[in-house]
Amino acid sequence: MHLSAVFNALLVSVLAAVLWKHVRLREHAATLEEELALGQQSLDPVLGLKIDYPKALQILMEGGTHMVCTGRTHTDRICRFKWLCYSNEAEEFIFFHGNSSVMLPNLGSRRFQPALLDLSTVEDHNAQYFNFVELPAAALRFMPKPVFVPDVALIANRFNPDNLMHVFHDDLLPLFYTLRQFPGLAQEARLFFMEGWGEGAHFDLYKLLSPKQPLLRAQLKTLGRLLCFSHAFVGLSKVTTWYQYGFVQPQGPKANILVSGNEIRQFTRFMTERLNVSHAGAPLGEEYILVFSRTQNRLILNEAELLLELAQEFQMKTVTVSLEDHTFADVVRLVSNASMLVSMHGAQLVTALFLPRGATVVELFPYAVNPDHYTPYKTLATLPGMDLQYVAWRNMIRENTVTHPERPWDQGGITHLDRAEQARILQSREVPRHLCCRNPEWLFRIYQDTRVDIPSLMQSIRRVVKGRPGPRRQRWAISLYPGKVREARCQASVQGATEARLSVSWQIPWNLKYLKVREVKYEVWLQEQGENTYVPYMLTLQNHTFTENIKPFTTYLVWVRCIFNRSLLGPFADVLVCST
């Protein structure tokens, strides 16, 4: 009787435990379903698309993540993912290994030396690296239910969304061409910015690039604890960038610039259309000079006098514009029809990319700031095909500057420095070359206000602008190169024991008959087989007989190429092997 009671008590306890666990599992399942429903409800209004959830979950749990990248190193790599996931709790991306997972390149531990790729276009910056954590797909059973992002995603970092130069150079231009690097991406993609900034002052410009609202990292938390992208591209093309900011060596143009004015102007045409200013015409009904007015720092102290003198010198209307008092669309409308743009050095000068061909950029530099050391806008203006004139003016008169040593350090203040360093900076006549970004002497000088010396400024402008400034009638701005010469032949003859002739002929490149070219020449290289040096010849005809230094019973290698207008060098035709 005693054993039976004990057995019954144990049985009741086990059944109660099983029932309790069953109830808890049902409650947990109901909670997960509720969370998923809520997550999907919050996701749908933002993303606007739906996905077959059971099918997507099955693909992810069985197949895992798939990655294929282009580019040889982390600085030029863009990766295409299927089923890449992101944990909002860990703030890390996840690669789930399943039966169909692919990881190309499969770098092993080299993926951390230093990263898989750069998320921004600022090359090899340690705050801009992208990587992921690896997990088996089976781990999904123990993780929060994934919320699937149905949109094609382009995932990247903005570098500094409050600075207009960085917005255009580092973000908008690269985004524009990355979206066009892969078919259909420009029409389908949603931009995901993962650097952690807020919207910033120019977020409306990012919205112009895609028909879908961009999302910030902070907004992802509202979508779910674990997000999985059905299709994502990660990284940005750096091919349109022209400037490096001085993190490793003092700032300056990139060593290998790959963008021309043609690509810049294709981008600005798109932007002006999206801003609804492309067909507005000249806003003032006449030619004018546009002066950027700054309202907080780096002021032009005699701005009214400058406007008057520019108007008198060039017999043109002068107007001012500022980022603070004008919408960006109005700024673009004014810049895109201006004959000349005058501004203190600063981010607003990146709007020069909207200037018409033939216009002039005049960049003003405060006292002790060498224009040759800070050239992002000069580099932009002088890109092949931009067809802009560029003038740099520097204040050389100490008395014409007003400094602000009492301001905070990030606005040029120096009172936090010791007295000796303050005295040195105050007496310095030129800021030495330096790295980015907190050099106190640079900040002190670049935030000065300036009284522009009008005569020296006019002299600087007149050295570049000989006549009346203004846009030129649009012309074909792309430099077209010759193709290979065709049907290259050689014929040799021996004149006795010591003399020989080598006759070489060819036909014009086939694309020449479709082009208008001012000057056509041909370059011929002759090299005796076995020698390390060659002899170049520049010719105007399509055949030539060489006699000087041509030896009997000798083999020569001959290369021929066409040159347009002295500087457009075509490819060499296949080498000719000629024996005398």
From Swiss-Prot:
Transmembrane segments: 5-25
Cytoplasmic-side segments: 1-4
Task performed by this protein: O-linked mannose beta-1,4-N-acetylglucosaminyltransferase that transfers UDP-N-acetyl-D-glucosamine to the 4-position of the mannose to generate N-acetyl-D-glucosamine-beta-1,4-O-D-mannosylprotein. Involved in the biosynthesis of the phosphorylated O-mannosyl trisaccharide (N-acetylgalactosamine-beta-3-N-acetylglucosamine-beta-4-(phosphate-6-)mannose), a carbohydrate structure present in alpha-dystroglycan (DAG1), which is required for binding laminin G-like domain-containing extracellular proteins with high affinity.
Gene3D superfamilies (UniProt xref): Immunoglobulins (2.60.40.10)
Keywords: Endoplasmic reticulum, Glycoprotein, Glycosyltransferase, Membrane, Signal-anchor, Transferase, Transmembrane, Transmembrane helix
Protein name: Protein O-linked-mannose beta-1,4-N-acetylglucosaminyltransferase 2
Species, as recorded: Mus musculus
A GO CC term attached to the entry: endoplasmic reticulum membrane
One GO MF term attached to the UniProt entry: protein O-acetylglucosaminyltransferase activity
SUPFAM superfamilies: Fibronectin type III (SSF49265)
Membrane topology: Single-pass type II membrane protein
Localization terms from the record: Endoplasmic reticulum membrane
Domain of life: Eukaryota
The keyword Transmembrane is assigned to this record: yes
